[in-house]
Amino acid sequence: VYLFCAIFILINCTNKELTFIEDVDGLKVDSMDPFYHGVASGDPLENKVIIWTRVTPEKTLSEISVKWKMSESKDFNEIINEGVFITNSKRDYTVKVDVDKLSPGKIYFYKFEALGKESMVGRTKTISDSISSLKIAAISCSDYQRGFFNAYGSLADEDLDAVIHLGDYIYEYKSRDYSNGIFKR
């Protein structure tokens, strides 16, 4: 019975209702277009690391060509690795590249380009080939809709080997609808 009700509600949800939910949340920042989900990196090894982003097209496209670049400097004066990744709606327009030919224990900068626009610049680091110590930051549940999380900026300024996020970041409910009114938070 519950499954039938859920399917009925989803089938009868109109585009107007879906647009309203997006407008209420207000999470789109025009300056990030079409990279609204930002950039991320992970799974570092001594000579490679995975970089990730998602492109959000204004309309459904059969495929999107996404250029990516990796550099040792923020200004990308010298590109040490680059390529093109073809994404599509079956992948939800996500991009996941396993960048290789990197040096151990080095900081790298990366960015993406699609639909005539560039993403923000990401920073990543490969694992050292001789680990005598490891500097890790651990962060936990963060509700993007409920705060600014300035502490993340401080973490970005630290000389860390890794940041591990142990919780959720985006929750599935309307903005300002988390508390039940008792706590008023």
Model-based region annotation:
Residues 2-11:
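Bacterial N-terminal signal peptides
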